[in-house]
């Protein structure tokens, strides 16, 4: 486990991002996922920041339809006397995550953001030379930046074994807060924010797989499933449907593990 180094807990099984799907105003979602691929779910706000993370994983078999209703409602109330909005329409296509999230690699996911917005000032001969972003040092600098650092946040959540609503990594990370408030005129576009938030909310992984061979297998899986993930089609071999009723009506990020 954790060799080569995967993440901050030294107990990471590896993960990658399947993508995002929309959520209806009543909190329901309807989408298709690849069969036999273990996954879990994050609820996202309108900025793409995780507000809570599912702390268990699941998977489905070819042709299976799964409904996640029962665990997210108060015990003393009856289910709504109306069908969820999401089941009244076709399954949503999954929008793939940013480059570098499948397979998941820090250098490919966050590296382009650093190159475009950070290294000009954060290099040995520049004004902000106290933090030098080189390929060898960038990861450790970012996971240890501020208090509580991303490393501290991840390890605390790992020990607690649960995800606290409203206290996600990208919500509370000092670097993310600094950039949102403004930092020497740095202006991140939507892709850059998506890359940073995805990396933080997947708990600061250095990488999501154990070998180059596994990376290649993940790329092949992504290419094979691209049509199913990106297009609204009827259920077919190798795919299944999920209907979910999350607590909060945000987007839902599908994370493959």
Show where each model-derived region lies.
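Aromatic- and Gly/Pro-enriched helix-to-coil junctions and flexible linker segments
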Residues: 13, 36-38, 42-57, 62-257
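Short, surface-exposed beta-strand/beta-hairpin micro-motifs centered on an aromatic residue
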Residues: 26-32
């Amino acid at each position: 486990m954790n060799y080569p180094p995967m993440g901050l807990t030294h107990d990471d099984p590896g993960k990658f991002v399947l993508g995002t799907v929309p959520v209806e105003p009543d909190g329901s979602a309807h989408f298709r996922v690849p069969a036999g691929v273990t996954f879990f779910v994050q609820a996202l706000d309108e900025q793409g920041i995780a507000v809570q993370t599912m702390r268990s994983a699941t998977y489905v078999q070819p042709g299976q339809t799964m409904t996640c209703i029962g665990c997210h409602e108060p015990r003393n109330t009856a289910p709504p006397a109306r069908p969820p909005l999401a089941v009244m329409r076709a399954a949503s296509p999954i929008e793939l995550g940013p480059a570098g999230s499948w397979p998941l690699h820090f250098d490919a996911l966050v590296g382009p953001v650093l190159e475009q917005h950070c290294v000009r000032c954060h290099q040995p001969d520049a004004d902000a030379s106290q933090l030098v972003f080189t390929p060898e040092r960038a990861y450790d600098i970012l996971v240890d930046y501020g208090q509580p650092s991303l490393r501290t946040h991840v390890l605390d959540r790992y020990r607690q074994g649960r995800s606290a609503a409203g206290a996600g990594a990208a919500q509370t990370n000092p670097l993310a807060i600094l950039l949102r408030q403004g930092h020497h005129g740095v202006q991140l576009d939507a892709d850059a924010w998506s890359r940073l938030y995805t990396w933080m909310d997947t708990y600061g992984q250095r990488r999501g797989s154990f070998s180059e061979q596994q990376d290649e297998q993940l790329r092949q899986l992504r290419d094979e499933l691209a049509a199913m993930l990106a297009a609204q089609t009827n259920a077919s071999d190798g795919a299944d449907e999920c209907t979910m009723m999350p607590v909060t009506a945000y987007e839902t990020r599908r994370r493959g593990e």
